[in-house]
């Protein structure tokens, strides 16, 4: 198990289309590494494999206060959604930037769990938003893609400043 480097925009690896996982046993170490990486952050609640430079269609989410209730989604897809609303989002790959994004507040997501068993999640709470955000990463999309060009520029300035400060 290892804490991996989280890529930051505009790294082109964040734009890669994820590949479906066909052998769940072969990604168990990656799942552990994704969880270790998520838990090593101060405020992360979700992480997708592309954010650490991997192409597998895997996301991990943990909304629990104690960070001890991980949700692992392999090959997830949003099969339906309703009731769009604006809500503030941030992203570990776009550090120090938050913006309002329109998302479904109610979704149905289908995926495989860590053991490879089919899973269907119907939710109308914060998890709905987080799942959409993380699943977007699997298509090479970031939350800032939903923003105006001006706001995208502002986001990238903040990211560059964050990366520069971190390098000191």
From Swiss-Prot:
* EC code(s) of this entry: 3.5.1.88
Catalysed conversion reaction? N-terminal N-formyl-L-methionyl-[peptide] + H2O = N-terminal L-methionyl-[peptide] + formate
Where are the disulfide bridges?
none
Annotated binding of Fe cation, by residue: 91, 133, 137
Required cofactor names: Fe(2+)
The GO annotation for biological process reads:
co-translational protein modification; translation
Source domain of life is Bacteria
List the Pfam families: Pep_deformylase
Positions annotated as active site in the UniProt record: 134
Record function comment: Removes the formyl group from the N-terminal Met of newly synthesized proteins. Requires at least a dipeptide for an efficient rate of reaction. N-terminal L-methionine is a prerequisite for activity but the enzyme has broad specificity at other positions.
Q: Which family does it belong to?
A: Belongs to the polypeptide deformylase family.
| Annotated protein name in UniProt | Peptide deformylase 2
Q: What species is given as this protein's source? A: Vibrio cholerae serotype O1 (strain ATCC 39315 / El Tor Inaba N16961)
């Amino acid at each position: 198990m290892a804490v991996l480097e989280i890529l930051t925009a505009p790294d082109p690896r964040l734009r890669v289309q994820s590949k479906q996982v066909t052998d769940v046993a072969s990604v168990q170490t990656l799942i552990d590494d994704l969880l270790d990486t998520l838990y090593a952050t101060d405020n992360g609640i979700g992480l997708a494999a592309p954010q650490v430079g991997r192409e597998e269609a895997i996301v991990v989410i943990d909304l629990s206060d104690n960070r001890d209730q991980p949700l692992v989604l392999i090959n997830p897809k949003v099969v339906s959604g309703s009731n769009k609303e604006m809500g503030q989002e941030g992203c570990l790959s776009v550090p120090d930037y938050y913006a309002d994004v329109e998302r479904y507040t109610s979704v149905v997501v289908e995926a495989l769990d860590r053991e490879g068993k089919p899973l269907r999640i119907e939710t109308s709470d914060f998890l709905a938003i987080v799942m959409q955000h993380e699943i977007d990463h699997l298509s090479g999309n970031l939350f800032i893609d939903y923003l105006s060009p001006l706001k995208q520029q502002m986001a990238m300035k903040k990211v560059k400043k964050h990366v520069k400060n971190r390098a000191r």
